[in-house]
C-alpha cells in the first residue's frame, strides 16, 4: 500500500526531552551484545502509541525498533517490555509474521530503563477499522491478510514455543 493510509499518529519525530536516550551507552551496549552491530546514525521516536516509548534506530544498512519502559515511578506489573520481548521471541519460531527479536536488556544503567530491540518491519498502521481511504479491493486484501495472520496466531502451540 502507498502512504495514503498514514495518519496523524504515524511516522517518527525527534526524541522528546522526557524520552531521551544516551546514545553513547546504547551504542556501547549493542556493540558488545549484537554481532556486527554498526554505528547508530539516528534515533527517532515513533509518533502515537499509549504506553512504552518506541524508537526507530537507524544504522547505515539496517533499521531497528527499540521499546522501553517509560522513565519515572511505575506500577510493578505495568509496562512489561520483558513480556513483549518473550512473546515476540517465541513467535519468531513460528510462521506468524513478527519482527525478529534481537535482545532484551534489564540493566537500567544503559538508557535509564529496561528495553528490548527488534527488527523494523515496514508497513502501515491502520488506525480506522473501516480504512476509509482504501478501495473495496484494497480493503478486502487487508482484511484477508489480517484474518490469515490471526488464524496463524490462534494455531500456535504456546506451550511448545515457550
Role assignments for model-derived ranges:
Residues 40-162:
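ATP-binding pocket architecture of kinase catalytic cores
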Amino acid at each position: 500500500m502507498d502512504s495514503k493510509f498514514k495518519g496523524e499518529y504515524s511516522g517518527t519525530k525527534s526524541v522528546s526531552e522526557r524520552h531521551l536516550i544516551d546514545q553513547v551507552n546504547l551504542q556501547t551496549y549493542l556493540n558488545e551484545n549484537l554481532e556486527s552491530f554498526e554505528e547508530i546514525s539516528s534515533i527517532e521516536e515513533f509518533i502515537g502509541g499509549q504506553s512504552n516509548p518506541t524508537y526507530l534506530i537507524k544504522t547505515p544498512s539496517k533499521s531497528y525498533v527499540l521499546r522501553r519502559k517509560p522513565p519515572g515511578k511505575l506500577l510493578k506489573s505495568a509496562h512489561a517490555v520483558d513480556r513483549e520481548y518473550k512473546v515476540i521471541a517465541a513467535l519468531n519460531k513460528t510462521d506468524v509474521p513478527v519482527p525478529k527479536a534481537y535482545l532484551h536488556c534489564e540493566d537500567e544503567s544503559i538508557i535509564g530503563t529496561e528495553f528490548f530491540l527488534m527488527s523494523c518491519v515496514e508497513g502501515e498502521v491502520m488506525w480506522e477499522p473501516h480504512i476509509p481511504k482504501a478501495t473495496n479491493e484494497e480493503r478486502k486484501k487487508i482484511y484477508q491478510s489480517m484474518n490469515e495472520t490471526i488464524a496463524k496466531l490462534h494455531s500456535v502451540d504456546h506451550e511448545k514455543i515457550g
